């Protein structure tokens, strides 16, 4: 038997080819579609979604803040009336991947097979992390969409210029997570000065998406900012409470709370949870949101 010096393995790891971003994204999209196919056979919606929920998942829960961890996320889902029967199926229409191939996002359209007919047609946004066992959802949002025809054709992918090897260094990842949170705060701070419309234009990528209204997704800065009035004063602020970021430092997600600038006197205003997917072209470039 041949014996290999430990340095051999270190050199081999260092010289291994970087992952192909397109191949990595194709694997993520395949996983998203496979979870949907599996969900179609489930006894209820929560059971169908459960296999893809990550152990460290953080999911916004309106009126309650956040469900943190897989068990809490599934418990919050079981409280949703429309999730108690039938099943969910979905189709992604866009995906994005980090340069190291360890994190990504998808968004698309979801349909419930039971429950209130007016609430069955939905849309979703998912942020994914790659685990040894496969892709899992770390942040997730779905909402009822407005009536209307939508295209389910795949959009152009969100890809880095090139792939890089993942870095297994907690300090590096922590620094990237902190930078994502800092970008979110700077976004909110800027909105206090120039208003929401201008801040959303300044801090978004040209292909940014907003899912909060309409039958489909608002894609592109003109569509994202269409609902904001020019010069309208900012009445809200927001910040990050949880975040994930790829070791390549080019993709991350911030999860936090939107609060009123004039909170209620009795303290009943708990704010509204949100999450934002951020991308930058390189670790020395500014973060810009790409999906929310």
Please provide the spans of the model-predicted regions.
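Sec-dependent signal peptide recognition
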Residues: 1-9
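A solvent-exposed, acidic/Ser-Thr-rich amphipathic alpha-helical stretch
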Residues: 23-26, 45-99, 117-119, 197-244, ...
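Generic short beta-strand segments
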Residues: 55-58, 107-113, 209, 255-261
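Short, low-complexity N-terminal intrinsically disordered segments enriched in polar/charged residues
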Residues: 14-51, 138, 144-202
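Short, structured motif recognition centered on aromatic/hydrophobic residues
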Residues: 35-36, 90, 103-107, 125-128, ...
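Short beta-strand edge/turn micro-motifs at domain boundaries
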Residues: 121-156, 271-292
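Solvent-exposed loop/turn segments at secondary-structure junctions
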Residues: 64-67, 111-113, 143-147, 215-218, ...
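A short acidic/glycine-rich loop-to-helix N-cap element
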Residues: 115-117, 151, 264-269
């Amino acid at each position: 038997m041949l014996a290999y010096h430990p340095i051999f393995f270190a050199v081999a790891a260092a010289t291994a080819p970087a992952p192909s971003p397109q191949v990595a994204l194709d694997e993520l999209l395949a996983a998203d579609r496979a979870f949907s196919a599996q969900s179609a056979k489930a006894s209820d919606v929560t059971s169908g979604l459960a296999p893809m929920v990550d152990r460290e998942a953080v999911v916004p829960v309106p009126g309650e803040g956040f469900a943190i961890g897989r068990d809490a996320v599934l418990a919050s889902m079981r409280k949703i009336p429309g999730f108690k029967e039938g099943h969910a199926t979905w189709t992604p229409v866009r995906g994005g991947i980090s340069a190291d191939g360890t994190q990504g996002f998808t968004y698309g359209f979801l349909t419930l097979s039971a429950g209130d007919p007016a609430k069955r047609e939905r849309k979703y946004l998912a942020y994914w992390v790659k685990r040894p066992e496969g892709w899992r959802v770390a942040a997730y949002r779905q909402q009822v969409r407005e009536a209307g025809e939508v295209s389910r054709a795949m959009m152009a992918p969100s890809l880095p210029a090139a792939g890089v090897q993942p870095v297994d260094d907690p300090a590096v990842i922590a620094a990237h997570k902190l930078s994502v949170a800092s970008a979110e705060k700077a976004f909110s701070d800027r909105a206090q000065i120039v208003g929401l419309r201008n801040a959303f234009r300044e801090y978004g990528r040209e292909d940014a998406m907003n899912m909060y209204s309409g039958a489909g997704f608002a894609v592109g800065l003109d569509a994202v900012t269409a609902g904001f009035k020019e010069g309208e004063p900012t009445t809200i602020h927001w910040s990050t409470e949880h975040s994930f970021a790829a070791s390549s430092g080019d993709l991350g997600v911030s999860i936090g709370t939107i609060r009123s600038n004039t909170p209620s006197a009795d303290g009943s205003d708990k704010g509204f949870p949100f999450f934002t997917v951020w991308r930058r072209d390189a670790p020395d470039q500014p973060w810009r949101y790409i999906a929310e």
